[in-house]
Design a protein with these regions (language model features):
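In a subset of proteins, long, contiguous C-terminal domains/tails are tracked
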Residues: 667-704
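Append "with occasional cross-activation on large, charged helical scaffolds in nucleic-acid assemblies
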Residues: 339, 358-641, 647-654, 658-665, ...
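Charge-lined substrate channels and their catalytic hotspots, especially those that engage the 3′ end
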Residues: 2-252, 259-305, 336-337, 341-346, ...
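Short acidic-glycine loop/turn motifs at beta-strand connectors
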Residues: 110, 239-240, 315-320, 419-423
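Covalent nucleotidyltransferase
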Residues: 285-345, 390, 526-528, 541, ...
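A generic structural signal for residues embedded in beta-strands
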Residues: 144, 630, 684-686
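Residue-level marker of beta-strand positions
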Residues: 66, 141, 320, 622, ...
Length: 704
């Protein structure tokens, strides 16, 4: 009787269950060689089918590298984890990583405890004991850390690390965005003190070792509200060429010599590495360098002697560079321009590009070129108009040549805000790059490309010295194929094979063809996604988007750390120094790329917050818009007047049962057959403005 019972004792065991029993057994006996007969006996496998199943399990585990067969029928665990162990370890590591992060949210205090309401889906809301609130009250915005995450618990336990202030206040919300992305909003006291110790005096010795451009016509062109002037241009006609009709110009691209003041390895330098870049939120700049340096000592302010690192070009009327050299210089800017002031000159003299919309100067401001006195016209100020017009013509030639070579023309409109002194958004507008912007852009690109080529281009067989390059790899062929297939939905074509220049030409034609169409935003977005992200690396692969074989960042050391690295290395190599440590600089390049991406995310979050804030007092109002995106979750709509974007959730479109047509990017109603297609005009009502989520919800306005 017992014999019969044993014979069928494990006939109901299943293979997954047996596999786990075998894994557990070998895990307990790691380091031991196990005979299968002992294994059968221990696991109670006394039937032939059970033993055969066990042998199958052992074979599987050998294939998975969990076991190794030391000799026939004798096995040992390899030490490699099982799939279950790997998943558990990954989950533990992920949990550990989450516990090291800082979380931002709004506090909700109850009788005996509190919750931090976060928008982080991985951790949800944090349970905060009363004794860990640090004085926070309901409605406060705070930062917090996780201190415990009990197994199986829905909410991790946290503690408040800083009370930022009341939710909804501009200063608090901007600090919250910075904290959300791990970005600093104040400078450590010791760094500020170190900056205050730096002298702004320029000594005779400083001047003696530099080329002196203080008597050469020099100016800056920047946004109206800028304070950190990284770059200046100087201009003079130096001589006529061989023919009487040919002219030669000396154009200096002068960049703030930050490396003169910030020494490598100093406390200021270490903080700059940590930040990597200045961060531009809607209402403020969070600078990479302390204010004394970025806005005062290094900033190329007018009528002040400033130390610069410069690329000096000799260029003819065809914008061909005949000679150039790199030099440490001293300059004295004659005039600080806003972009609008320079653009107004181009428009007044008929030199603006046809596509540029007319520029409006602030109320009461007269064009600078119409206000010069006779006395001023006899000074360098009187030569500014001619210099700017000449530089504009040269910049257009440089730009035209760049696009003929294969540069890709991605110019996406950017939403900007008019804000009051308290940071409240009063209105929105679209930032558009015009000729004045492009003038500066082209000469900065020329300087960046030139210094990169001077280090990177070496004779065959020689190795180039280490330099951080700004690289942009060629787009992935599979993504281009997907883009080509995608645009056929709208009647467009994209040939994605050929040389890089041919592909770029085809991309530019596509972008030109969709300009002004209802599908423009979506096609541009999908095309951008087909592109690789530009980044920093010491391994040069060129810059696809700009069509440059060599490119770096040299022109903005006040606000970008890679530019400061490039300045130091150029100075080192000019003095005959050896090539820098590649591992060190590649690590700094990786960190700079990460910091750049983080800053961009914070900047976008601040724009989204201000859009929602701008619409918060317009709940219930009706607006005209364009469908800017169609998904299975609903419709994205961009309002015509404010350019704010929100969503009509599919769950709220209850007048019909709508299905998502992915092929044609539209929602269509099964009963009434109404269709909503990308680019369609639409009327919406503002339904919700959730500042915590930075989210606008619209409701569809149905026509009666």
């Amino acid at each position: 009787m017992s014999k019969g019972k044993n014979r069928g004792g494990n006939r109901h065991i299943r293979k997954p269950q047996l596999a786990q029993m075998v894994i557990d057994y070998f895990t307990r006996h790691t380091g031991e060689v196990i005979d299968v007969r002992n294994l059968f006996r221990t696991l109670g496998l006394n039937t032939h089918p059970g033993k055969l199943m066990c042998m199958d399990v052992l074979d599987d585990l050998v294939e998975q590298d969990f076991l190794i067969e030391r000799e026939p029928l004798r096995y040992e665990r390899t030490g490699l984890p099982t799939e279950r162990e790997r998943r558990q370890k990954e989950a533990e590591e992920r949990r550990k990583l989450l516990m090291e992060k800082t979380y931002v949210g709004r506090i909700n205090v109850r009788k005996d405890f509190a919750f931090l309401l976060t928008e982080n889906r991985e951790v949800g809301d944090l349970f905060i004991p009363k004794n860990q609130l640090k004085g926070a009250q309901t409605g406060d915005k705070v930062t917090a850390r996780i201190v415990d995450w009990p197994e199986g618990s829905k909410n991790p336990v946290g503690r408040v690390t800083e009370v930022l202030g009341r939710s909804g206040e501009n200063e608090v919300e901007m600090h919250a965005i910075l904290a959300e992305f791990g970005l600093p909003y104040t400078y450590p006291k010791n760094v500020e003190e170190a900056a205050n110790q730096i002298s702004d005096k320029i000594t005779p010795a400083d001047i003696a070792e530099r080329e002196d451009f203080r008597d050469v016509l020099t100016f800056t062109i920047d946004p109206r509200d800028a304070k950190d002037f990284d770059d200046a241009l100087s201009f003079r006609e130096i001589k006529s060429g061989k023919s009487s009709n040919s002219k030669l110009f000396e154009i200096g691209v002068h960049i703030a010599d930050v490396s003169h003041y910030v020494t490598e390895g100093s406390i200021i330098d270490k903080e700059a590495i940590r930040r990597g870049t200045s961060v531009y939120l809607v209402d403020r700049t969070v600078p990479m360098l302390p204010e004394r340096l970025c806005n005062y000592i290094c900033s190329l302010r007018p009528d002040e002697d400033k130390l610069t690192y410069s690329v000096i070009f000799e260029m003819n009327e065809k914008a061909e560079v005949k000679r150039w050299h790199l030099a440490h210089t001293i300059i004295r800017s004659d005039r600080r321009f806003a972009y609008e002031e320079v653009q107004a000159l181009f428009e007044a003299r008929g030199e603006a590009s046809p596509e540029d919309t007319p520029t409006t100067l602030p109320d009461g401001e007269k064009p600078w070129f119409d206000t010069l006195t006779e006395e001023q016209k006899a000074t360098p100020l009187g030569k500014l108009e001619g210099a700017l017009l000449c530089l504009n013509r040269l910049a257009k030639l440089l730009r035209e040549r760049r696009f003929l070579k294969g540069a890709v023309d991605f110019e996406r409109p950017e939403v900007r805000f008019d804000i009051d002194e308290k940071g409240k958004p009063l209105g929105t507008y679209i930032k558009v790059a015009k000729d004045a912007n492009k003038l500066i852009e082209e000469f900065m690109l020329l300087a960046n490309r030139t210094v990169a080529e001077s280090i990177g281009r070496v004779p065959k067989g020689k190795k180039a010295k280490v330099l951080p390059y700004r690289i942009h790899e060629q787009p992935d062929q599979d993504k281009l194929a997907n883009l080509s297939q995608f645009v056929t939905k709208f009647g467009h074509k994209l040939k994605y094979t050929g040389t890089p220049a041919e592909i770029s030409k085809n991309l530019n034609k596509l972008l030109h063809d969709v300009h002004g169409s209802k599908e423009q935003n979506l096609v541009e977005m999908v095309a951008l996604r087909a592109m690789m992200k530009a980044r920093y690396s010491i391994v040069n692969v060129g810059h696809y988007g700009l069509a440059f074989d060599y490119y770096t960042h040299f022109t903005s050391p006040i606000r970008r750390y890679p530019d400061l690295m490039v300045h130091r290395l150029l100075s080192r190599y000019a003095e005959g120094g050896r090539s820098a440590n590649p591992e060190k600089y590649e690590a700094l390049c990786d960190l700079s790329s990460e910091n750049e991406q983080t800053a961009a995310l914070a900047e976008r979050a601040s724009i989204k917050y201000k859009q929602v804030e701008f619409m918060a007092d317009k709940i219930g109002k009706i607006f005209e818009g364009i469908i800017s995106g169609v998904t299975e979750f609903g419709l994205y709509v961009e309002l015509n007047d404010s350019h704010c974007e929100g969503m009509i959730p599919l769950r709220d479109m209850d007048d019909d049962y709508y299905e998502f047509d992915e092929r044609n990017y539209q929602l269509w109603g099964k009963r009434h057959h109404r269709r909503f297609t990308l680019g369609d005009p639409i009327r919406v009502r503002v339904a919700k403005a959730n500042l915590d989520k930075k989210q606008l919800d619209f409701a569809l306005v149905t026509e009666k």
